[in-house]
Amino acid sequence: MSELLLELFSEEIPAFMQKNAEEAYLNIFTKIFKENEIFAQVQVFVGPRRITLHATNLPKVILPKEEEIKGPSIEAPEIAINGFCKVHNVNKFDLSTKLINKKLYYFFVKKTQAREMKEILPKIIIDAINKYSWIKSMFWGCYKIKWIRPLRNILCIFDGEILPLQFGHLSANNITYGHRLTNNKKLEIIDFENYRNKLLENNVILERLKREEIIKVGLLELANAQNLNIKQDARLIEEVTGLNEFPVVLLGKIPQKFLELPEEVIISVMRKHQKYFCLFDKTGNFAPYFLFVINGRFVNIELILQGNEKVLSARLADALYFYKHDIAKTLESRFSKLESVIFHAKLGSLKEKVDRITDICRYIAPDNIDLIMAARLCKSDLVSDMVGEFPDLQGIMGYYYAKHEGLNEEVAKAIRDHYKPQGLNDNVPSGNATLLALADKLDSLVGLIIVGETPNGSGDPYALRRQALGIIRIIIENKLEINFINLINFAVSLYKVPTNTHLDSVISFFEERAKFYFKNDYDIALINAVLDLNLVDTKFKLDTLKEFLVQDVGKQLLNAYKRVSNIIGNQKITGLVDVSLFSTQYEKELFEVIQIISQQIIAIIANKDYKKALNLLSSLLKPITSFFDNVLVNDSDPKIAQNRLSLLHNTCEVFDKVVKFCRL
C-alpha cells in the first residue's frame, strides 16, 4: 500500500483558526477519499506556517468494477426510458431486463476502468483544499487563488515521487522549510517519516498536541520551581500553541514598582497584549512573576528574557501612568463627559443611558441610596484613560476608582459587577449589582428593540439574546420577586414612545428567550403550560409540574383532562351549568367537587403552593371517571347535552387555573 504526503506552506496562520482547520481538513479528506472508494488512514497536522496531510493504506491502482443500475420498468413511458439511457450514455438495446415482484425492469451494467492512484489524486486534493472555507481569506499578488494567508509552497509526494499537482500558480515539489528564525532552509523530503524527522532536526514540532503538551509541562515545572500556582487558561494555551513551532517556556519577573497597579490591570496587560501567563502564591495572591513561551531554541536566552521583561515593563509603565492620572479625578467629575459618548445613534449618549438606568433603579428600590449612587457612576470609568486603553477592564476600574475616592464597598462592587453575567459560564452578580445589572441590561434591550435592532436569524450585533438571558438568570438565580411586566412598561416609558406597541414586542422577545433558557431542563409542552414573566414562579411551577406528571396520579390526571378536553373540542361553550337539568347523580357529583375545589384552588395558588393545588385537582379523577362511565354527553335532548358540555367546560377551567393543561 502507498503513502501520500501533502504540505500547504504559508505565511502565519492565525492561531485561533488552526484547530478548526485541522479538524475540518481531516473530515474533508476522509470524506472525499471515501467518495472515491479510497479507504485510507488520514492524519492532519497544523502549525503556524503549515497544514500537513498524511494518508496511508492507499492502493496504487483502483481496480475495475461492475455496477448494476436499475432503470424504469419496461412498461414505463418511452420518454422515461430514453431519459435513463441519456443519463448513463447507453443505447436502449444495450439494456438488460430483470423480473422484480412480477414486473420487468430495465438494467444497465456500468463498468469502470482500472485507475492509477497518482492520476486521480491531483483532482481529489485540489477539490479537498477548496472545500474548506476560512472565516476570512485573501487574494495576494496578481494570483487568482485565495487562502487564509499567502501560500508560498506546496509539497506533495506519493510513494516517494513528486505528484504533478498544480494549485493556482504553485506547482507541487518535494521541498519544505525549517524554523523561520533558526533554521529557515530548504529541506528535501522523501516520505512522511523523513519529513517529520527533518522538521524536528530543524526546530519544528509537527504535532499540535505535542507542542501543547510541551507548553503545559514547561509552565507547570517553572511554576513549581518557584512554589507558585499557575491559573489554568486553556484558551491562552491554545493560542500560544498556534504561535510557536518549537515552544520553549521561560520565567520572567515583574518589577516591584508596578505592583501598586490593580492585579486585573497587570493580568490584562500580560494575557491580552503579551500572551503571558500569570502566577499566584499558595494563598491565591498575585505573584510578581510571569511565564511566557518563545518560538525556538536560542543561544542567548538571557537576552530574550531581558527583552520580554523590558517590553512588559514598558506596557505596565503606560498602565501605571494612566492609573495615576485617572485617580486624580472622581467618578462624579467624569459624569458630564458621558454626554459626548454615543450609546447608539438613535438612542442618544451614554449620559442619557445612565439617567435611564438610574430611573429604573429608583423605580425598583426607591430607598436604596447605594444602588442609586452606583447607577449614576456605573459608566464613568468608560471615559477614563485606563479603560480607553484596556476596554476589558470596564467596571473593574470603576470599582478601584470608587474605592480610592472613599465610596463604600457596596457602591464599588455594584459598579464592578453590573456587567455580569457575561456569557453562560459567568456567575450572576449579587448585592446591589443584581439590580444595577438588571437595569442596565433592560434599558439596552428595550431601547434597541424600540429602534428596530431586534435580532434576525443568526445575526445579533448588539448581543440582545445574551442580554435577555442575563436578565432571566439574574431574576431566577437571585429569586427576585418583581412584577417584570410593570418593570418593562416603565423602562419603555422612559423612551417617550407609544408604550403599548413596543411593550408587546419586548414581552414577546423575553418570552422566547425564557423558553430557550428553560428548554434544556424541561419539555417544551411543560414550559408552554406554565410560562409567564414571573420567572421565579415559572421555575417553581416547572419543577413542581415535572415531578407531579411522572407520578401515576399525575399521568391519570392528565389523561382525564385530555378526555374532557377532547369531548369539548373546538366548540364554543357558553352559558352557566343548570343543576335542574341534571338527570344523573354522576353529573351532580362532578359539579359539587368542582364547586368545592374551585374556591380552594384560588387561595392555594395565591400562596403559590402548586403541589397542593395539583394534588387537589386529583380529587376530580373519580367523579370524571364515573361521569364518562355512566353518562352520555350527547343526549337526545339538546338542552341536557349542552348543559353537560358546560359542565365539562367548567371542569377544564378548574384545571387551567393551576396550569394550562390544554398545552400539555
Curated annotation (Swiss-Prot):
Its main subcellular localisation, reduced to a broad class, is cytoplasm
Q: Which UniProt keywords apply?
A: Aminoacyl-tRNA synthetase, ATP-binding, Cytoplasm, Ligase, Nucleotide-binding, Protein biosynthesis
Q: Does the keyword tRNA processing apply?
A: no
Location of the protein in the cell: Cytoplasm
EC identifiers of the protein: 6.1.1.14
> Any transmembrane segments, and where?
none
Q: Which InterPro entries match?
A: DALR_anticod-bd, Gly-tRNA-synth_bsu, Gly-tRNA-synth_heterodimer
Q: Which PROSITE patterns match?
A: AA_TRNA_LIGASE_II_GLYAB
Task: Return the GO cellular component terms, semicolon-separated.
Answer: cytosol
* A biological process term (GO) from this entry: glycyl-tRNA aminoacylation
Q: Where is the signal peptide?
A: none
One example GO MF annotation = ATP binding
Pfam families cross-referenced by the UniProt entry:
DALR_1, tRNA_synt_2f
Reaction it catalyzes: tRNA(Gly) + glycine + ATP = glycyl-tRNA(Gly) + AMP + diphosphate
The entry assigns this protein to a family as follows: Belongs to the class-II aminoacyl-tRNA synthetase family.
Subunit info?
Tetramer of two alpha and two beta subunits.
- In Swiss-Prot or TrEMBL terms, this protein is called Glycine--tRNA ligase beta subunit
The record lists the lineage as: Bacteria, Pseudomonadati, Pseudomonadota, Alphaproteobacteria, Rickettsiales
